[in-house]
């Protein structure tokens, strides 16, 4: 979070010069760029620090079905579940409804039921949303593009 506070202290005075509608427009654009980057990173199965996600656990009876061979979180990264919002005071990227509950279990490595009435399992920690190395530069580039377009 130290990177975010340094970014905020640098950008804050520039944003104060904008009208609230202009800040909201900029925040929406930043949130959309971050949403796109988060979705791509989830598709690559990488955490914000660049490490690979922990693999799925092997089942006791190995089944060679399609689900086991596909990437994890394929539907979570869709814009239907991964939303971006921005207003005059903030830009945010988040999961909604049931997707938020699933993402939280994986993000924090919690215990959850595999299916209703099924066994409870501790999931490996897989950081889905986070501030990656390139995200700070992405925010700065979006800000500079917005300010140069005024």
Predicted regions and their residues:
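Short, Lys/Arg-rich flexible segments
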Residues: 1-150
């Amino acid at each position: 979070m130290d990177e975010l506070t340094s970014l905020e202290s640098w950008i804050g005075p520039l944003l104060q010069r904008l009208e609230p509608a202009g800040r909201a427009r900029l925040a929406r654009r930043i949130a959309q760029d971050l949403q796109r980057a988060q979705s791509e990173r989830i598709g690559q199965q990488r955490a914000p620090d660049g490490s690979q996600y922990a693999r799925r656990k092997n089942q006791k009876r190995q089944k060679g079905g399609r689900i086991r061979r596909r990437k994890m979180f394929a539907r979570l990264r869709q814009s239907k579940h991964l939303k971006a919002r921005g207003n005059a005071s903030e830009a945010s990227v988040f999961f909604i409804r049931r997707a938020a509950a699933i993402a939280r279990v994986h993000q924090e490595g919690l215990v959850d039921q595999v299916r209703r009435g099924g066994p409870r399992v501790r999931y490996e920690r897989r950081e889905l949303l986070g501030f990656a190395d390139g995200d700070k530069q992405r925010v700065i580039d979006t800000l500079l593009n917005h300010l140069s377009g005024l």
